[in-house]
A protein has these predicted regions:
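Ser/Thr/Asn(+Pro)-rich, low-complexity disordered segments
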Residues: 2-400
Length: 400
């Protein structure tokens, strides 16, 4: 619990004007990340519930965030935000040369947090009523179906006024983007048709898998499952327990992906230092050679604490083993003022100086989901989400 309290302080690295999450601890102070802020919103709820902050403090912070997102000076495109925003002015900060407009996936992570917050801040007082009203406005303004590029049976990741559809990145499964389709189907105002899910998301050469790795069958995704953040970002709100659709049992998918990632680290085919039963977890993070999406197919010797820690609902015993190892064996090299640093490579004797919002947020939220299911229960209780899941043919205990 002490550790969780320390990690929770990570949220104090919020931007003073917007209340949103800064992208990283060692970067430009005005860059806030929309996806990481969605995770931050969920972490704020956890903080209030655990008593790290009062409910009133959490509500004030939440109000600051939704006021900023609703402000006419904060850029959005058909109701969808950019990946990076200036936390002072609300202006878009380009993520890459052509990526200077809407980012549908990052915005989906934001809405995952906002809909959970809508359900959490349910008191009949001025501040919480205002929070709910502003979240409803944002939710109703988001034009999910615009991102079918004029009615195609697939969602596109980016659009900008300057570059139109030139990024041309179709969102297909299976990866971290599942929540994007769920929310798009759940929209009360600009929903996608179910065919967009079935012919877009599920129609990809790396969607169905079914092969065995280390004797573990992987239902969906690329070989070995890819980086572990695929099991975190969409499923911080979306509860995979008992969640099934026409294609997969998502509880099975999350567990298999996690156990395969760990088994690969134990096998350690590249012979990196440190890998083993207690030291495992490959996912996207900083590394000694820069940022990379680490996974069995892209293994650079970098272990990222968020990989094992955020997988605690899927493999609690192994996750806690890793947590103990990181804390007790690596100690001060890895533990700092905001909890565990982003990553380390023992072969290169390298420890990240940084903390990233998209890596810290899931740790807090997934530990809470493991303990009480708090964020899962909130998100899954939203009536629009339930309608969307029903529309796409999902089965979940929440629909009974």
């Amino acid at each position: 619990s002490r550790g969780l309290g320390d990690v929770y302080k990570r949220q104090d690295y919020g931007h003073p004007v917007s209340g949103l999450a800064r992208e990283r601890s060692n970067g430009n102070d005005d860059i806030v990340t929309i996806g990481g802020s969605g995770f931050g919103v969920m972490a704020i709820i956890v903080g209030a519930e655990r008593g790290f902050v009062t409910r009133e403090q959490a509500a004030e912070r939440m109000l600051k965030i939704v006021n900023f997102l609703n402000d006419k000076n904060t850029d959005s495109y058909h109701g969808i935000w950019a990946h990076w925003i200036n936390g002072q002015s609300g202006e878009t900060i380009s993520f890459s040369r052509k990526d200077d407009g809407a980012d549908l996936v990052e915005s989906a992570f934001m809405f995952e947090g906002l809909l959970a917050a809508h359900q959490y801040f349910n008191k009949d007082n001025q501040v919480e009523r205002r929070i709910r009203a502003l979240i409803n406005d944002l939710w109703r303004q988001a034009e999910w179906n615009w991102f079918t590029k004029g009615g195609e049976d697939v969602l596109y990741w980016h659009w900008s006024p300057n570059n139109g559809w030139s990024m041309n990145h179709q969102i297909k499964g299976h990866n971290e983007c599942h929540i994007t389709y769920i929310l798009a189907a759940s929209s009360p105002t600009y929903p996608i048709a179910e065919s967009v899910y079935h012919k877009g998301w599920a129609n990809s050469i790396v969607f169905k898998n079914g092969k065995k790795y280390y004797d573990i069958t992987l239902p969906l995704g690329s070989d070995y499952g890819g980086p572990l953040f695929f099991t975190h970002y969409s499923y911080m709100g979306l509860d995979p327990r008992g969640l099934k659709d026409y294609y997969a049992d998502y509880e099975e998918q999350m567990k298999a992906h996690t156990l395969i990632n760990r088994a690969y680290c134990i096998d350690n085919p590249k012979g990196y230092k440190g890998y083993g039963e207690q030291c495992w977890g490959l996912t996207a993070s900083d590394g000694d050679k820069g940022y990379s999406a680490h996974c069995p197919g892209n293994d650079r010797g970098v272990i990222t604490p968020t990989a094992a820690l955020s997988s605690i609902p899927y493999a609690p015993e192994y996750s806690l083993q890793a947590m103990r190892y990181f804390y007790e064996e690596l100690g001060d090299k890895l533990w700092g003022e905001y909890g565990f640093k982003d990553a380390f490579n023992l072969t290169a004797d390298w420890f990240a100086p940084s903390y990233l919002a998209i890596d810290q947020g899931p740790i807090i939220v997934m530990i809470e989901n493991y303990r009480t299911g708090l964020i899962w229960k909130l998100f899954m209780s939203h009536p629009d989400v339930q309608k969307g899941l029903k529309k796409l043919g999902f089965k979940t205990p929440y629909l009974n």
